[in-house]
Curated annotation (Swiss-Prot):
GO terms for molecular function: aspartic-type endopeptidase activity; endopeptidase activity. It comes from the Bacteria. This is Lipoprotein signal peptidase. It is found in: Cell inner membrane. It comes from Coxiella burnetii (strain RSA 493 / Nine Mile phase I). Pfam families: Peptidase_A8 (PF01252). Belongs to the peptidase A8 family. GO terms for cellular component: plasma membrane. InterPro entries: Peptidase_A8 (IPR001872). Pathway: Protein modification; lipoprotein biosynthesis (signal peptide cleavage).
Length: 163
């Protein structure tokens, strides 16, 4: 169903801006109050541990000599432009799709800002079970994951118009 699109979908970009602001504020606080590599226990399964990631998710390509920073920044920018265009063409009634796109855009641009400013992304959220630690991540990464999840759920729940 395509109704009330374009201009009416643009306010969802303000939600992306909110995600960017929360991400950048959390990274500022992490850099201000945490020490690199020294975990601070928050809950039995959660630490805040400052980490600088020059790669992508799970530090993919993080040990390369620097080309990956430009590569991942470019991908973040291009994907964000594509998603903004998609958002502008999405029906205002498709709330789950709009929310998912907004979260992904905000997360991608939050990490894009880090790559441009510092040549790395600040990660600090460290989930663990005893001595097993999941990859350290940040608010932008969380927004991207939740956004992708919402898009998948939306696509699974929305009937296809094709026979």
């Amino acid at each position: 169903m395509v109704t009330k699109k374009s201009k009416k979908a643009w306010p969802w970009l303000w939600f992306s801006v909110l995600v960017i602001l929360l991400d950048q504020l959390s990274k500022y606080l992490a850099n201000h109050f945490l020490s690199l590599g020294h975990p601070v226990k928050i809950l039995p399964f959660l630490n805040f541990t400052l980490n600088y990631n020059t790669g992508a998710a799970f530090s993919f390509l993080g040990t390369e000599n620097g080309w990956q920073i430009i590569f991942f920044a470019a991908i973040s920018f291009v994907v964000s432009i594509f998603l903004i265009l998609w958002l502008s063409r999405t029906s205002r009634s498709e709330i789950m799709m709009l929310l998912g796109l907004s979260l992904i855009i905000g997360g991608a641009l939050g990490n894009f800002i880090d790559r441009l400013r510092w040549s790395y992304v600040t990660d600090f959220i460290d989930f663990h079970i005893k001595d097993w630690h999941f990859a350290t991540f940040n608010v932008a990464d969380s927004a991207i994951c939740v956004g992708v999840f919402l898009l998948i759920v939306h696509m699974l729940l929305t009937p296809s118009s094709k026979p």
